[in-house]
Amino acid sequence: ALKKKIINTIEQVFINYGFEPLETPPFEKSENIGSFLANDETNPMSDVFLFKDEKESLTLRYDLSAPLSRFVAQNFRDLIFPYKRYAYGDVFRQEKADSARFRSFTQFDADVIGDANEAQVDAEICNIIADSFLNCGLNKNQFTINVSNKKILQGLLAELKVEDQKQYRVLKSIDKLDRIGPDGVGELLKQGRKDKSGAFTKGCELSNDQVSEILSFLNLKKIKELKTNLKNPLSVEGVQELEELLEVISYGKNIDLVKVDVTKIRGLSYYSGFLVETNLNFKAKNVKGKEIEIGSCASGGRY
């Protein structure tokens, strides 16, 4: 009953913002899924459940973005753009389950496709997240909407002359900052890191100077600091887009919930600019009553 109430509450928020519903099957052709997965040099389909019928390979949907892209491609001539759609349903991940990761869970999705003012659309996504959490009963102190822009870090890596083939691994290493801290990230950026279990993860093999510059960048918390310290044109463009986003959000009621955090870079390579990652500011309890950390609860970006 509680889950149904939460679903109905969030759905009404999406409707209030002018989004229309779309339902898609839980299966997709495997060929339609691949480009939406995290890069895995050895097995790009390692995160999904694969099945084969008599004719073709099928995949349980990993998220709701790939089905949307397939739907839009098939119905492009019949849709009115910008096309605003929401969807919810179960998604499936072939990964090791733990306290904050599940192999199956219900996901809500809101996307805007087509030409529109980027800052306004990105701000709308932030406001949808805020209204959804508040309407579900959380107060403003219980969650934070962290925003960043992928161009900022991409520009820095270009400035530091980090080779293209290393850049994705660098981003993945930085994405682990909350879990392993700056020292752990530094190890991953250099030769590698051994975790508590003894498992060794090969590093990115960057130079000491490159690692030092990246770790210094991760300490920048304000727009003014970013504008002062970053000179690469792509980084400057990303900071400007972030500044425009915050200006639009400031006209509404949710600006106090939004925080700039350039360490939030998301794991998927298809993101191209604006990034958002929402975190709870409290610990939850599992079925055994043990306190656990909950990962990102509402995240995404421009792609």
Specify the residue positions occupied by each region the protein language model found.
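Glycine-rich, mobile lid/loop segments that gate access to catalytic sites or pores
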Residues: 144-155, 161
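A short beta-strand-loop structural module common to alpha/beta enzyme folds
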Residues: 20-26
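Acidic, His- and aromatic-enriched active-site or binding-groove loops in soluble protein domains
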Residues: 42-53, 160-191, 280, 284
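Polyanion/phosphate-binding surface patch
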Residues: 26-58, 101
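General small-molecule cofactor/ligand-binding pocket signal
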Residues: 22, 146, 258-261
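Positively charged, Gly/Ser-enriched RNA/tRNA-binding surfaces
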Residues: 2-17, 28-29, 55, 65-77, ...
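Charged, amphipathic alpha-helical linkers/stalks
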Residues: 135, 159-160
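Phosphate/dinucleotide-binding and metal-coordinating scaffold of catalytic cores
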Residues: 80
